[in-house]
Regions:
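Amphipathic alpha-helical coiled-coil
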Residues: 1-432
Length: 432
């Protein structure tokens, strides 16, 4: 499992985890696992708890699509070690994971589409290549030619993941995934969900919103808290400020600027001794200071060894993915991916998790000067208006998924735009 995790830095340079961190998490999972008298049962409970615990700890660090990739890699390693007969051969697994250059195959004879107008020529070429590398599908071209109508219906089926493969019995989900890669790549995500659900459990498919309280609970004074800013991500500063107030902590926000490095370093050193929180914003903008940032983190570790580090201190930072971010800070820190949601419901829930909607007072109708305050509860119209604005924002965000069809001029419509709109609506209502 650790090697699956360590391979994720090929996907994103910010996905780095140390073996020291992994061992600590692993031991916590073993202690939390259900007890059993039989050794076989105890091992099964430990394996299940380790998988679940590790996934819960690392999932906040991954973008949503990378989280799916990580879960699939966990499935592959699980089946490889279990020796499952339903899993793929090395050749089949290589075919699944490899991008195929079809230009090299164009000159080969016998790859012509046998008069199937609904099947693209590239898809047919991939099917022939699959038949050459898979024992399960070694007669695939012949079976398609003998069952043209059934394969035509299968190809156009809207629920192709649940539909049996024509001419085959008992095809595993993994083999079906290879087949869908050839003819219906749009169904790969759906069948990946089915495989994850059946192999390691549906809990590995849940996309939880970023929860500061949970991540904070995993930390101590020597643990950097890193907000990784995804494309079109919102600024987490206001959310962190609200959380710091809730924890009754003084949050010092620093912006890394050239010429003010010494001021930043002194502020962090002072906060480490008095127990304040420090947020260093946009670390990716000052590459030349990153080596000093790593040295500063080592100073914090030295303070901890000498028992001079305040237990309430926390070092927070925001950064876009960058190869020069200090490796030691990444490996020892808790990473939290800040990304825009991909579904309407998630977009709305994300909005309710940010300011000013987190503030209960915001939901009371704004009162203009000289106007008598309304009793609490008589704010239905105001609440509906605010909710409608949130839904409008979610619609505008998701229209961007349709590229030029959605918006002629692309714009991210981030959470900051919604926040300013909500505050403006509040202001206009007061002055109306």
């Amino acid at each position: 499992l650790y090697f699956v995790l360590s391979d994720m830095d090929w996907v994103n340079c910010m996905y780095r985890f140390s073996i020291k961190w992994f061992n600590k998490v692993f031991l916590s999972a073993v202690r939390a696992a259900k007890r059993a008298r039989e050794v076989v049962d105890r091992v099964r409970f430990i394996n299940r708890e380790v998988n679940s615990y590790i996934f819960r700890r690392v999932s906040p660090a991954f973008a949503s699509y990378d989280r799916l990739s990580f879960a699939m890699c966990m499935c592959i390693r699980t089946l490889e070690h279990s020796g499952s007969g339903d899993f793929l051969s090395n050749a089949e697994l290589g075919f699944l994971l490899t991008h195929h250059d079809l230009s090299e195959m164009s000159e080969r004879e016998g790859l012509e589409n046998p008069g199937l107008p609904w099947l693209h020529a590239e898809h047919w070429t991939l099917l022939v290549m699959l038949s050459e590398q898979s024992e399960v599908f070694n007669e695939l071209p012949q079976i398609i030619s003998e069952n043209v109508e059934k394969w035509h219906n299968f190809y156009h089926c809207s629920s192709i993941v649940e539909t049996p493969v024509p001419g085959y019995k008992g095809v595993s989900e993994w083999h079906k995934m290879i087949l869908l890669k050839c003819i219906r790549p749009d169904s790969i995500i759906n069948i990946s969900h089915a495989i994850i659900r059946d192999t390691i459990g549906s809990e590995f498919l849940k996309r939880e919103r970023l929860k500061l309280n949970r991540c904070y609970g995993y930390s101590d004074a020597t643990t950097p808290m890193i907000f990784v800013l995804h494309e079109s991500a919102y600024d987490p500063t206001e959310t962190l400020r609200k959380y710091a107030n809730k924890k009754d902590k003084n949050l010092i926000v620093l912006s890394v600027q050239k010429g003010r490095e010494e001021v930043t370093e002194k502020t962090i050193r002072d906060a480490a001794k008095c127990g304040d929180w420090v947020l260093v914003e946009n670390c990716h903008l000052l590459q030349s200071w990153m080596h000093r940032f790593e040295e500063l983190f080592e100073e914090i570790l030295t303070l901890a060894k000498n028992e001079a580090l305040h237990s309430g201190f926390r070092l927070w930072c925001t950064s876009e993915p960058c190869a020069y971010f200090p490796v030691q800070v990444l490996q020892e820190g808790i990473k939290m991916m800040v990304e825009s949601p991909t579904e309407f419901r998630e977009t709305v829930l994300e909005a309710f998790d940010t300011m000013p909607l987190q503030d209960q007072d915001y939901w009371e109708r704004p009162v203009a000067e000289g106007e008598e305050a309304q009793p609490k509860g008589e704010t239905t119209v105001w609440k509906r208006t605010a909710f409608a604005l949130v839904c409008l924002h979610a619609n505008m965000v998701l229209r961007g998924d349709y590229s030029g069809i959605g918006w002629n001029c692309p714009y991210s419509f981030g959470i900051e735009d919604l926040r300013l709109s909500l505050l403006s609506m509040n202001l206009f209502t007061k002055s109306a």
